[in-house]
């Protein structure tokens, strides 16, 4: 029994009988799965408040009572009459939460929470104390498709009540959509176009929810009680809202035709546009922003907002968009940007980047529709004057327009010359690429996937001007101890066999960030211990990453790393790069893999070494490596994860092309603004065979052991709560190890590796010395 819960999970439900008066077994089963997903949380200090909002079903009540009555963490509230979602939520939160509860988490009756959802969200809130409301990544799954998969497995009854098995199936189904909404930097900006925080994924501070600030029933804005609460929290209360940025979904959202949101989708869209206009007008008045240009137009604010609510693919299919709509939409974006910047000045740079991206999409479509119109060219000039990033310029240079192409390319080249006077070679390459890409699709086509069969592998800059060597880029957040161990063992086991005649340069960079002053001080200790390393405080991940990889990198190869990697066997980066150089059809050299990797911890299942793998011996010094084709059917999980940040070596020109591919498909803001997203979005277009099918091969060591492992003693984004995590440490625990002068016992890890005890890339054993 938990008498002092920290989190109150509120789950309202209404389950009616089927149309033929039979019991709604599907609805009941979905509810049970939803409840069980909370019971199976790794974080245990919770209470679950179940609100039956007028089901009036004795069989249902008896079933739930029999199944859950012995769990004192679960409370039942039964409304004999249907009160509606707003009154049910307000009553549960204001009147039925335990006094000790500090946070409120939402849950819906047909969704599934990942086992680490509450733990991950609480950890984030405790590390980011200024955040008041927090969402998380979700994966949206179609209920009919899931039932079809279960039926095909011939074990429907066994799986349908098993939370982890269901999550496993949903994660492995590529047709189910992963959704990652923006973080605090641009959440307000994004909120005016569409609701970008998923209600059942939310956890918020209990202290912000009062009689004066709660969910509202508003006839002016029906069916969007959550969206209204977010807007009111942001604009009227000045609260901070964010979403966890991770490639791991923490909530699985079920979509089916019987859901309230599905039945009222058009009304919700209309209410969303009305509410957006209402709160934007509040901001315009608050900051004396002159919106007369919009008010005097033939288009209403609502019409322009509804224009922005359409997806890029939908917009690209509309042939009769007037040039005036493009003009007013651009001006409206300027007003929204100005109001958001006034409301949240700390995020002004991120808001500007997001505005540039949306304006870029608008200008792209305008030029495609009106290639010979002077107003289109003026819009382009206006957007260009905002100094958008070179990546956005590069995308828009690929517009499929006629007479505007020369204007665009000239302006891009002029802008590049003005901003990058020292990069003449790069500008010349860009000019050539721009001239060769006039027939490519626009940014909107890349984003929406239209005509994907016409999308070619992105062109990359030639590596012939790069110098012989490798740049190591390690990412770290709040884990100074693990970063110290990464660097200590990296230099301990790095073999340097330069003979002076064939210099191989190695540069090590660390891009790090921290959430509080304590961790900042810890990083300072690490910085002082490794003067040979370039430490860079993360301020803008996207810009800094591109600067390291593309703008300032002079070396031929790049290896990405994360701070929880530990090296324990000797390794030779030069040999690995030479092996990659000898295999032009290979994408990367994967230091984490070896012939003993036969288990994938993230999906909790055994995997096999690719049957087509061959041991290759280089003639120079008989160095041996393993080579396999990742496109073969038996290449699963770790053996088909081409874009990887765990000590994988890539050619610099391939990295350029993959980054360009990420931006084309997912946008610069959403594509590469975080290490997890950078890795996840890099894999999606490769695995889905949209890019890089001309390099299907992968390389690794031919031995049965690797020089390193990912030591997950403090996990960040893992999918499954496997037994290897029994000794998981908190960030504070790790920091204490740093100040106690402790180290990971790399000799012990080496001993286990040579004994072939490590069958997974990720290991959870904790050996301290």
Swiss-Prot record:
CC terms in the record's Gene Ontology section: cytoplasm
Site (Important for Gal- and Fuc-transferase activities): 509
Catalyzed reactions: an N-acetyl-beta-D-glucosaminyl derivative + UDP-alpha-D-galactose = a beta-D-galactosyl-(1->3)-N-acetyl-beta-D-glucosaminyl derivative + UDP + H(+); a beta-D-galactosyl-(1->3)-N-acetyl-beta-D-glucosaminyl derivative + GDP-beta-L-fucose = an alpha-L-Fuc-(1->2)-beta-D-Gal-(1->3)-beta-D-GlcNAc derivative + GDP + H(+)
GO molecular function term, any single one: fucosyltransferase activity
Low complexity compositional bias, start-end: 410-441
Site (Important for Gal-transferase activity): residue numbering on this chain: 53, 226
Keywords: Glycosyltransferase, Transferase
Region (Alpha-1,2-fucosyltransferase): 442-769
One of the Pfam families matching this protein, by short name: Glycos_transf_2
Gene Ontology process terms (BP): SCF complex assembly
InterPro entries named in the record: Glyco_trans_2-like, Glycosyltransf_2, Nucleotide-diphossugar_trans
Region (Disordered): 410-442
EC number: 2.4.1.-, 2.4.1.69
Consequence of substituting residue 654 to N: Loss of Fuc-transferase activity and 80% decrease in Gal-transferase activity
Gene3D superfamilies, per the entry: Spore Coat Polysaccharide Biosynthesis Protein SpsA, Chain A (3.90.550.10)
Effect the entry attributes to changing residue 509 to N: 39-60% decrease in both Gal- and Fuc-transferase activities
Annotated segments matching region N-acetylgalactosamine 3-beta-galactosyltransferase: 25-210
Family of this protein: Belongs to the glycosyltransferase 2 family.
Function in brief: Bifunctional protein composed of 2 glycosyltransferase domains involved in glycosylating skp1. The N-terminal part catalyzes the transfer of a galactose residue to GlcNAc-skp1 in a beta 1-3 linkage. The C-terminal part catalyzes the transfer of a fucose residue to Gal-GlcNAc-skp1 in an alpha 1-2 linkage.
Full protein name: Bifunctional glycosyltransferase pgtA
Organism: Dictyostelium discoideum
Gene that this polypeptide is encoded by: pgtA
